């Protein structure tokens, strides 16, 4: 691994006597870690824990995750362990029992968004944003698979959030960066690194922070992170923000065995993850509280709603498909009926009024007259009422062929919608037509790789 000279000199200055151990760690295989979805499984795998994340686990080796149906079912997410430290920021600084408005600004592919969704209360509204459209669709897919039902996925530039003044209690900005912390995982990142790129990244990060700052409530919390080590993109940017705005960094409690390195530069409290000290990739995080006192939201004359409620007839057709249907508001856009926790309606409508929303809540059904088609979002929802449907459990080969959108046969006969499951966790829908079965797995989500002749024995959860 040939590292750039200026990068090497800076890391020697930052790490001192620890530099040789750092270099050695860069030659080692990165650890593989996953985070379970507590809304879908209560399993506790017999695996080493990620100590700062309740649902985080290290795997002994990296399997072919594509060949585990439970990944596609949203039962867990493959996430780098260092970035799970966001959990400590939320738990130590924020009252997670309260209803909150939370923004994940740079959300794709969905690691932090799905993590946030597991930590906040069900009556909190989360907005997960991605500026690049193709990546925003990937984010929406992963949010749908997670199935929490209280997330809106948007496709906006950070400056657009200025329209939502003092709207968010919590903002997560995992800023685009020079990627120094990914060097051992992605050798291409080394080739793309330069001092000029570091400068450009730092300037872009400042623009992003400036663009979204007005949308954070006074007293609200910003969690800022990068996967890089230089001070310019990290502590110096937060010091710059503190000078520009009324803001202070917050100190978190660390356990020595975690191996996380606290930093104190220009009055900024930061947290660094180095691979020779912490079991994870390179990462930086700082937690910032915005100055001022939260204002009571003014109650003015309500503008016309942008969201459209489903009619009573349409609602009656689908409401028993969710557990506790009275807790939801039922929305209709064209032929699609969606569900959103009822307390979130006004806040969600405000987001719809001001941003470009790709995905909201849980998509339940497509209605055409009296014909109903259950949608993939319902199958993967944590609020699905499985008792409303006929279910069929698939073995590993059947599940993977279903996820490849191949025809499968279960030897059944009828004309019902079937909820297909693997290890009792829903994967999606099929429609029986006599002794034939139509596969309704979304084409754009299908597994594209060819299945090996011998399927792997790996599965993260045994039951």
Predicted regions and their residues:
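Polybasic, low-complexity RNA-engagement segments
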Residues: 1-14, 18-41, 291-463
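Conserved AdoMet
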Residues: 30-85
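Conserved class I S-adenosyl-L-methionine
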Residues: 97-108
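Conserved SAM-binding loop of SAM-dependent methyltransferases across substrates and taxa
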Residues: 109-122
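Helix-to-beta-strand junctions that scaffold the AdoMet/dcAdoMet cofactor pocket
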Residues: 121, 216-218
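S-adenosyl-L-methionine
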Residues: 129-166, 173
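Mobile active-site "lid"/loop adjacent to the S-adenosyl-L-methionine
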Residues: 134, 169-211, 227-234, 256-258
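Class I S-adenosyl-L-methionine
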Residues: 168, 221-224, 228-339, 343
């Amino acid at each position: 691994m040939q590292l750039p000279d200026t990068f090497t000199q800076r890391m020697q200055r930052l790490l001192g006597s620890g530099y040789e151990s750092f270099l050695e760690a860069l030659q080692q295989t990165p650890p593989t870690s996953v985070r379970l979805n507590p809304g879908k499984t209560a399993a506790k795998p017999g695996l080493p824990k990620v100590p700062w994340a309740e649902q985080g686990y290290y795997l002994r080796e990296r399997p072919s995750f594509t060949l585990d149906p439970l990944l596609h079912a949203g039962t867990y997410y493959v996430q780098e362990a260092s970035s799970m430290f966001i959990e400590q920021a939320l738990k130590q600084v924020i009252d997670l029992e309260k209803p909150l408005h939370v923004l994940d600004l740079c959300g794709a592919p969905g690691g932090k968004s799905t993590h946030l969704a597991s930590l906040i209360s069900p009556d909190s509204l989360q907005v997960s944003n991605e500026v690049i459209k193709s990546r925003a669709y990937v984010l929406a897919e992963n949010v749908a698979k997670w199935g929490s039902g209280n997330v809106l996925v948007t496709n906006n530039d950070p400056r657009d959030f200025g329209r939502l003044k003092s709207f968010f209690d919590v903002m997560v900005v995992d800023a685009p960066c020079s990627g120094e912390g990914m060097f051992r995982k992605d050798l291409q990142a080394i080739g793309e690194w330069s001092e000029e790129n570091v400068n450009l990244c730092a300037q872009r990060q400042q623009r992003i922070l400036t663009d979204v700052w007005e949308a954070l409530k006074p007293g609200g919390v910003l969690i800022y992170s990068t996967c890089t080590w230089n001070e310019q993109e990290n502590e110096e940017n937060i010091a710059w923000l503190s000078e520009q705005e009324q803001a202070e960094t917050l100190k978190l409690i660390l356990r020595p065995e975690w191996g996380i390195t606290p930093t104190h530069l220009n009055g900024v409290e930061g947290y660094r993850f180095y691979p020779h000290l912490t079991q994870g990739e390179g990462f930086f995080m700082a937690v910032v509280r915005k100055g001022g006192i939260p204002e009571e939201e003014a109650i003015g004359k309500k503008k016309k709603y942008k969201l459209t409620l489903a009619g009573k007839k349409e609602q009656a057709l689908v409401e028993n498909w969710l557990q506790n249907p009275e807790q939801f508001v039922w929305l209709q856009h064209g032929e699609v009926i969606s569900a959103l926790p009822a307390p979130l309606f006004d806040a969600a409508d405000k987001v719809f009024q001001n941003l470009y929303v790709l995905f909201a809540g849980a998509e339940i059904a497509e209605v055409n007259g009296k014909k109903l088609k259950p949608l993939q979002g319902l199958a993967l929802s944590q609020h699905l009422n499985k008792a409303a449907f006929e279910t069929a459990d698939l073995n590993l080969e059947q599940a993977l062929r279903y996820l490849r959108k191949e025809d499968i046969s279960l030897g059944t006969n009828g004309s019902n919608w079937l909820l297909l499951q693997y290890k009792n966790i829903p994967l999606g829908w099929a429609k029986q037509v006599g002794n034939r079965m139509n596969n309704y797995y979304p084409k754009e989500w299908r597994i594209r790789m060819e299945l090996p002749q011998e399927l792997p024995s790996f599965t993260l959860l045994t039951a």
